[in-house]
Amino acid sequence: WLQTYRPEWQVHVTAMTGGLTSINAAGPRSRDLLNRLVDDVDLSPDAFPYFSVRTGTVAGVADCIIWRIGFTGELSYEVHVPSGYALHVWETLLATGEDLGVAPFGVEAQRILRLEKGHYIVGQDTDGLSKAPTAGLGGLVKLDKPDTVGLPELKHAYERTDLPVLVGVQPDDPMIVPEEASQIVDGETNTILGRITSSRMSPTLGRSVCLAQVDPSLAAPGTTITVLLGNGSRIPATVQQHHAHVDPEGARQRV
């Protein structure tokens, strides 16, 4: 981007991603675990709040990047380790946290947790028509800043009323999990008014949970929508107040 916007700067970009391995320590005891292996970073909530980053030593490995973020909705840290030391850090985390009940968790478990929390996957729950105000990110955008690259487009997005809106959806029958990409239709005309973008059965709630892109006319909480399933049947579902089905206040990840 800088090479096209400021060609006179002669910017060169070196990809560093391949030199780092990311390990996600998540759960109510994740801070306890990292405190045993990190001695040069204060992990207390006040010193290291949610959505912040530090650089420190983990399991004796220097220059690790520690983010207090995560995709699970729980207290969580992403630890980015120089790849040559990744196996050492991984094995040390498991051994050190044995009495805490530490265990590996897979991508499918992460995807269920993120959906319960309402975290969306870019490119699955969003698309080319998704904009900050319709994807639940309106509070992160400051339109009163001095002119910046992309500001006219952002302002235009806030003025539009025809863009699809990302919402949380709950099937009225909690045991039905609509297939992802199931169409949301007008019950009388079959006009397509949206689609289910993510869906899973929630072990936490014992029911299905979904995210969906819907026409603005259906985006208000409490609105009943019609979902067309792959077998041709239709089910009613209700638009929820939040994207998050679990802990919408974010209390778990901010402790």
Regions found by a protein language model. Give the residues of each.
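Conserved, structured C-terminal
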Residues: 1-255
